[in-house]
């Protein structure tokens, strides 16, 4: 029903890029004269980064406890996580590259695998969830094509899409605040589905299909206030989202506050929001908390399904590589079903391998 021709989609995207470049940005500044080559030896890590650069490389383990709406313990489980994403650069500046991301998690809202300890059997699969080409022909324009992760602006996974979500398609990002006021303008066309088939190789066939569109703007007004707004069409459903973040470092109670919400306008109407705040102590300990109201089933954070919930979390940076974090979530008031989680507690220990590689000059 929503299928479109890939050729026509690519043509429209290319035409939009060219039109924007010629009309809005005009002529590019004259090229600067390159300095004479230096005889200083290039470090080994820099030689690697010329061609290959890691964005993320970490492992973690999580204990998760869930109690349902009827006070039944439905999960006491130890899980593990791997996140690895890097890019191959065709040119030294990285204007043209191919990125790939390998992750645990067997669905669109899952980024963890079961160890076999506790509830459920072991899960050992890893999936290439992201694989996409990036082009930055000029400073103001970025194009992504392939298996991509959604972008939320100032919203978070509470009211937008889960941090582990994925889709197939194209995204055009324009960063030209001097010409277009907004810091970022994002236009997306693609297919969002195959929720239990996370491997990008099983989803490449969706590149010639379209059931997901998004138009988003984002703006930082000053050092204290930033906002975003977007319209999303997803498989027949129309949704608007807005988010605003206030940075208030002089306020002793919190460093920042965020309000985010969504309005589903068609076919069924719905509304949800979250308000949250956070405080960091000596760059080591971060405390956060808030309240969320979600009234409809969607691909948002799996730990915050339908219902009203209070949440509080913490993140302790033990060393450059090691972090210990946790979150407590408590449903308040009526919940949709007997099996809906009423209480959830997560405790996470993570090791950032990328920081170790940087320490030894390998990235």
What residue ranges belong to the model's regions?
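Beta-barrel outer-membrane channel/assembly domains of diderm bacteria
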Residues: 26-143, 172, 176-177, 220, ...
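Short, well-structured alpha-helical patches and their helix-loop capping segments
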Residues: 125, 160-164, 311
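Bacterial N-terminal signal peptides
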Residues: 12-21
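Short acidic, glycine/Ser/Thr-rich loop/turn "cap" segments at secondary-structure junctions
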Residues: 114-117, 150-158
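Signature for the C-terminal beta-barrel architecture of outer-membrane proteins
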Residues: 34-47, 52-58, 72-79, 93-97, ...
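Flexible, glycine-rich linker and terminal segments associated
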Residues: 258-268, 277-363
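N-terminal secretory signal peptides that target proteins for export/translocation
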Residues: 1-8
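Residues on the solvent-exposed faces and adjacent turns
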Residues: 147
